[in-house]
Amino acid sequence: MKSWVVTLCLAIITVALTAESYLIQAVIVDPKEHPVSEVVISDGSKTVFSNEKGYFLINTSADTLTFHRLGFQEKKLSVKNIGKKVILTPEPVVLPRITVSDVAWNIVSPPPDKISLPIDPDRHYYSAGEVLTTNPAIHSNDVPLPGESQNISILGNLSRHSLIILDGVPLNPDGSSFDLSLLDPNNIESVDIIKNNVSVYGGSSAIGGIVMISTKKGLQQTGKQFSISTELGSFGYAQNSLSFTFNQPSTIFRINLSNLSTDNDFRYKVPEWWSPDSTAIRSNNAKHQNSLAASYTHLNKKSHFSFQTEYLSFMRQLPGTVNFTEIYKNASLSGWANRNRFNLNAPLFSGELGTLIWLNLDQTTYDNTKAPLPVYLSHYKQSLLNAGIHGSYGQNSSLTPELSLNTSLSAEAGYNSYQNNNLLNSANNIDFSSRFANSILKTELKMDKGEFIWSNSGAIRYDLTEQENEFTWRLESSLQSLGYIETTIGGTLGTSFALPSPYDLYWKGDSQALGNPDLKSEHSQGWQLWMSNQWNKLYLKSAFHKNDIENLIQWRQIQMWGNVWKPLNIGKARIKNVEIEAGWQPWEWLNLSTSALFTNAKDISEHNEEAAPYLVYIPGRNYSLKMELNWKKLKLWSDYHYSGKQYTTPDNLTEPFPGYSLLDLGLNYSMFIQGWNVSPFFTIRNALNKQYDIYAYVPQPGIAFYGGVSLQVSNP
């Protein structure tokens, strides 16, 4: 598989050599000749910013450049007509772009390795997990169907080591993984990723990295917008959504409703040794989900406050593994989740003050009391409460015209509560609560010389918990050269931790699994180095990661009056990664990209690295190849993904599952009818109808078809 990646990269480089390019350097000023900083200069595929003196440098092969900054009229100029000076005309600010500060560091100096995932507004994603897995560093082993549980892994780390942050609020700081299917993809505005040991920014569970999700708050201009969409697909799938947005100069309101229903009863091939040349149907697998999301934002000069709330209810049939269908038949999980956030941002002295208050409530009920073969009867109700307050202050200080010092400080306090009520045996009830507090300090020294930008920063964090107190840190450095070839090199070094979840500590709900109250927190230390190059419309990037994890928690089968599963601190694990990315957009209507991730994840607690066994369910190789064709009304896209073999037992003695490849295809068409934007869309998933395995006795779906239409109308 390496050969096609190398061949494609060489082909991209060869063709790009023939492209005509322009190296443009100029200064941006207002009509009074004052320099304008932080202007966004874009050629459609690449973006740069003007520095504090108004200067910018860009290498482009496009015909035009667009200049945009809040408080000024947007300007578009031909590259042949751009001289040494660009004048922007001021205009009153009607609606500033609404941002929610995740933590203090995001106010003044985001990490240099933060990556923004592209979200196609015309593409229809079946879950938030699908949005994230478009990045090769993010992988999911869950069934890729609407309504199914969706957990993700960053750089081969465990899913519980991926911290999900929603509008600044961590959703899984308790050491568990987060189910992304509980987030409505129609309500996602943007996604940012920070990889490799970032507990200093998010706290527990950020060993692998952080995924920061921002929800939609409103339009980028005043007016009203109404949209409705409906979609049908394979396996009894149907989804309907409706949204309304109201924007005024000082008030923004948005509401989104969504309903999903699917049977997910797909046909799969039975293993050859079980029943040769036969198939079966994955039945008893229906999923239903309803969601409501609303947000309100009020603007007052340079400050604003906002409130967001989401409510989601769901019901899932859980058929279990196909070798125990009669034991889990009619089993189900139902429940609801409610998330609320209040955010206030305001200028203070020469900096910015941010306040965030949140309340998250979750409740689920598991019922396995109606199985024909009542071996593992279980019926329990879980409740989770997470509340807290976060305050932050950030300030930018100019030491010299070229040198700036950015400082930020934040503090947080909150409360967690977890209850598990066993409805068959109240003696097995679990009641767990804890308080937490933390503080973060970050400083950044940044030098902007016009032709290059050099940034060095450090952050420290101290967490107070009722289990253990944790100290984490992170060092960051990056150097960006803005010459004919735009080059960026950088690296980070840091530590992280992950608390054992209440489930790991106290579970006692059945005879097959038992919690371990003696578990220790997991700790890690790791580094990463990266280099990226942008030349014309060609983009190349490579990155190297290493992470050592101590006290890694894994569930193992032990002998305790019979076989019992119990979580244990197995010792030490080491995860190494090599990332390679390439992208090329030779014309505005064609976008090509490819990527590869090589992972070496091993349990080194008892062996040296060479002889150590691989960690389970972590593919050693991931490749992707994507193509987009964009015309005025029609868009076509394809997404090919290959995932390598995975070991399924800790000792690696069982033959690993082989690698598999998937191809997804889609199209969107847009047209205006009587003032309405009508957009039919169609998607084919697993277009090659591949049969593959990720977990034993958990079948994966074959080819699936989805299609629908969205209607949208806007009024000024």
Kindly label every feature range from the protein language model.
Residues 226-231, 330-346, 382, 481-486, ...:
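Outer-membrane beta-barrel signature, preferentially recognizing the C-terminal barrel domain
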Residues 56, 169-197:
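Short acidic/polar hinge/loop motifs at secondary-structure boundaries
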Residues 216-246, 257, 279-285:
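Short strand-turn segments of transmembrane beta-barrel domains in outer membranes
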Residues 86, 185-227:
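A beta-strand signature from Gram-negative outer-membrane beta-barrel systems
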Residues 71, 247-333:
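Periplasmic-side early beta-strands and strand-to-turn transitions of outer-membrane beta-barrels
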Residues 42, 46-47, 53-55, 98-124, ...:
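N-terminal periplasmic "start-of-domain" segments of outer-membrane beta-barrel proteins
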Residues 129-170:
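Extracytoplasmic beta-strand/coil segments of soluble accessory domains associated
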Residues 395, 448-453, 546-548, 569-648, ...:
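Gram-negative outer-membrane beta-barrel transporters
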